[in-house]
């Protein structure tokens, strides 16, 4: 008999959680998705109803998994407890990582592939630099983070301000750069700067709030195992990469991107279309890779982004205006999927700093 559960939340995080639980626990059946706010919620997710958290219409003996942003977990847990629920599991960052990794182990195994992670590999010596993007608009961290010796802070959008961040040893407005595009391209102005100006043989990109969780000897392991690329552990989104973007952003930007790809290379465009019907991508425009791989990626990626941005222009709201960065997450994931037989790719978890 199936174990019936509730998931609190009905949007992207909750749907991702549902995919993990259903894949890992085939005996689990989702009774409903719950909510208690005034946001616009779907009536159903797939065939599962989305219902308001109210007294009298729920099975309080069922377990509840909270699939929302962590800042809401305490408030939601209190609301659930007040209605009589006892089996409440907030899906925090640590549990999300465990579920995501277990899901990907199973996903890769079912396709006859190994899910390789950097911390499982052996070691040997090498040097490299991971550039950490930071801007004058970034909110302060609640707790101080000490950068690793291999991390270099790069101030992004430096061409748009006279203010300099004292902890940043590099700015993205020197040499060949696109620093003035930072309001649209976000951390991609750092990526472009790294491509055109950085001198390391192995380079990476992270954010001031998001860093890779790496073993101390990750550089050595990368060399001895001939790893070409380290990407963030993939994230599952529903209903597909394509529809997830089109629902959360302007669908016309997506449509123009696909039309541009088709006009440039019809075969590649079809491969991209097929990939974007799937659900897994490496988020946040983060990576560590060998220089020659970076050169190939950026030479392929930036012409696409420049074409879309040139066509779609700027948006009035700051979040929507960042569409080139959201497109690039999907494009980078597609690039490495279509080249997975050429490059030795492994994955690493990442953190999120409050």
Identify what each model region corresponds to.
Residues 1-4, 61, 122-129:
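A short, charged/proline- and glycine-enriched loop
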Residues 2-21:
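Glycine-rich adenosine-cofactor-binding loop
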Residues 5-9, 65, 210, 285-286:
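A residue-level structural signature of the nucleotidyltransferase/glycosyltransferase Rossmann-like core
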Residues 14-17, 72-77, 138-139, 191, ...:
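Short, well-ordered alpha-helical microsegments
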Residues 16, 49-56, 328-335:
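A short, acidic, amphipathic alpha-helical segment used as a generic capping/interface helix at domain edges
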Residues 31-36:
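Short internal beta-strands
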Residues 38-113:
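Phosphate-bearing ligand-interacting subdomains
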Residues 105-354:
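ER/Golgi luminal nucleotide-sugar-dependent glycosyltransferases, focusing on the catalytic module
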């Amino acid at each position: 008999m199936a174990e019936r559960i509730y998931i609190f939340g009905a949007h992207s995080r909750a749907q991702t959680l549902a995919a993990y639980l259903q894949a890992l626990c085939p005996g689990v059946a989702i009774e409903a998705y719950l909510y208690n706010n005034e946001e616009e919620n779907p009536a159903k997710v797939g065939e599962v109803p989305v219902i308001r958290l109210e007294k009298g219409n729920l099975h309080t003996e069922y377990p509840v998994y909270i699939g929302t942003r962590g800042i809401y977990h305490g408030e939601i847990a209190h609301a659930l407890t007040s209605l009589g629920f006892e089996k409440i599991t907030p899906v925090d960052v640590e549990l999300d990582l465990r579920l995501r990794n277990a899901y990907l182990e199973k996903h890769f195994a079912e396709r006859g592939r190994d899910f390789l992670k950097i911390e499982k590999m052996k070691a040997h010596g090498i040097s490299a630099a991971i550039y950490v993007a930071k801007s004058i608009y970034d909110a302060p961290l609640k707790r101080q983070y000490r950068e690793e010796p291999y991390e270099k802070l790069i101030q992004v959008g430096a061409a748009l301000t006279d203010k300099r961040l004292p902890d940043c040893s590099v700015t993205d407005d020197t040499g060949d750069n696109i620093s003035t595009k930072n309001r649209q391209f976000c951390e991609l102005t750092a990526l472009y700067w790294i491509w055109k100006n950085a001198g390391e043989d192995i380079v990476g990109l992270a954010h001031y709030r998001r860093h890779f969780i790496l073993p101390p000897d990750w550089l050595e392991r990368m060399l001895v195992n001939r790893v070409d690329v380290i990407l963030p552990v993939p994230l599952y989104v529903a209903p597909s990469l394509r529809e997830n973007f089109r629902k959360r952003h302007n669908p016309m930007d997506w449509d123009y991107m696909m039309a541009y790809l088709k006009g440039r290379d019809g075969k590649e465009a079809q491969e991209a279309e097929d990939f974007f019907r799937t659900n897994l991508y490496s988020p946040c425009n983060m990576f560590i890779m060998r220089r020659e791989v970076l050169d190939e990626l950026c030479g392929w990626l930036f012409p696409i982004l420049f074409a879309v941005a040139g066509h779609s222009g700027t948006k009035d709201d700051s979040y929507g205006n960042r569409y080139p960065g959201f497109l690039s997450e999907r494009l980078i994931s597609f690039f490495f999927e279509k080249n997975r037989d050429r490059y030795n790719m492994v994955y690493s978890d990442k953190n999120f700093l409050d």
